Amino acid sequence: MTPILFVDRDGTLITEPADFQIDAYEKLRFVDGVIPAMLKLRDAGYQFVIVSNQDGLGSESYPQASFDGPNNLMLQIFASQGIVFREVLIDCSWPADNAPTRKPGVGLMVPYLQDRTIDWSRSAMVGDRITDIQFAQNLNIRGFQLRTEQFGGDWDWAGIAHELADAPRRAVVQRNTKETRIRVELDLDRVAEPHTATGLPFFDHMLEQIGKHGGFALDIRAEGDLHIDEHHTIEDTGLALGQALREALGDKRGIGRYGFDPDDSPWRVAGDTTQHGFTLPMDETIASAALDFSGRPYFVFDGDFKRERVGDMPTELVPHFFRSVCDASGLNLHLHVRGENDHHKVEGCFKALARALRQAIRREGTALPSTKGAL
């Protein structure tokens, strides 16, 4: 499936003059940032189609030859930089004609609407006018109005390329049951201070470690039946967080997939064969996490706690929380901890997971990290 970026011409690829007609070579100027942005989108798998209204093109007031020269030069310059358009679609009608082929009408789109090889979920439209956004709405695709002096707009080409090619990995999960109401919001491509409020201060402190040391924006709000005990709140928070990770990662293209420590980690302790994965020290405690976003949930925990609870968090729910995250995210996680202080051991587990996540979710290209073709 191939995503298509439909683009307006005047004011979007090339700047629009005061008379709204680019009918001379000296009027040809490219919009800032358009070429590097389109190269990035090309490398992300996009094909390009120009869709442009050219009022009265071919008439005495706007001869075809006056249009063709600058337009052909524009296409040649794009091609010289590695940007080739799949098609150039021009509507020559006047606004008063109300032609179905004139944007925001989609009359020119019939062959594309019949093409089952197009990935419409990723396709988009870029233009400088509100009619371009209406055109996108009529196609049921995303529309970006480029920022211009004439018509406003909120986007520049760099931002559009980031939004589409980098596909910011965000998720908002609302999990409501008779026992809990959990909301998790995360953005794997934005660094921000974590915010958590579950009614369990120590648990909040642990959840903050995941966002802080995982290097991504994390907001968790939970209301649970704490008058009974902590089990439902902690378990359902893990399930909601796991679901959010799964949704934000999408098809997992480009990610590292694995989170682990290389064999020459400076944190390894000689003679301790139980340690593997991302190994993290915390005073006398050492914790390690190795993980794989394989899509096959599996959890192994090696550790114990002397105390029944740390703060307001029962220690028996520490591995249960991580198991819940694995079940909902499709994560394979091996978590090991050794130490004397249970506070340090619990916190070490959360921090080790966070650092392993940081490595696994990092994007390193666009390839799918699996020979199976799916994760």
UniProtKB/Swiss-Prot annotation:
Pathway(s) of this molecule: Amino-acid biosynthesis; L-histidine biosynthesis; L-histidine from 5-phospho-alpha-D-ribose 1-diphosphate: step 6/9; Amino-acid biosynthesis; L-histidine biosynthesis; L-histidine from 5-phospho-alpha-D-ribose 1-diphosphate: step 8/9
Name of the molecule in the record: Histidine biosynthesis bifunctional protein HisB
One Pfam family cited in the UniProt record for this chain: Hydrolase_like
Lineage: Bacteria, Pseudomonadati, Pseudomonadota, Gammaproteobacteria, Lysobacterales
Any single Gene Ontology cellular-component annotation: cytoplasm
Binding site residues for Mg(2+): 8, 10, 128
Family, as annotated: In the N-terminal section; belongs to the histidinol-phosphatase family.
Cofactor(s) needed for function: Mg(2+)
Classification via InterPro entries: HAD-like_sf, HAD-SF_hydro_IIIA, HAD_sf, His_synth_bifunc_HisB, HisB_N, Histidinol-phos, IGPD_sf, ImidazoleglycerolP_deHydtase
GO molecular function terms listed in the Swiss-Prot or TrEMBL record: histidinol-phosphatase activity; imidazoleglycerol-phosphate dehydratase activity; metal ion binding
Region listing for Histidinol-phosphatase, in residue ranges: 1-168
PANTHER family: IMIDAZOLEGLYCEROL-PHOSPHATE DEHYDRATASE, IMIDAZOLEGLYCEROL-PHOSPHATE DEHYDRATASE HIS7
Alphabetic keyword roster: Amino-acid biosynthesis, Cytoplasm, Histidine biosynthesis, Hydrolase, Lyase, Magnesium, Metal-binding, Multifunctional enzyme
Catalysed reaction, written as an equation: D-erythro-1-(imidazol-4-yl)glycerol 3-phosphate = 3-(imidazol-4-yl)-2-oxopropyl phosphate + H2O; L-histidinol phosphate + H2O = L-histidinol + phosphate
NCBIfam families named in the record: HAD-SF-IIIA, hisB_Nterm, Histidinol-ppas, PRK00951.2-1, PRK05446.1
SUPFAM superfamilies with a match to the protein in the record: HAD-like, Ribosomal protein S5 domain 2-like
HAMAP family in the cross-refs: Bifunc_HisB, HisB
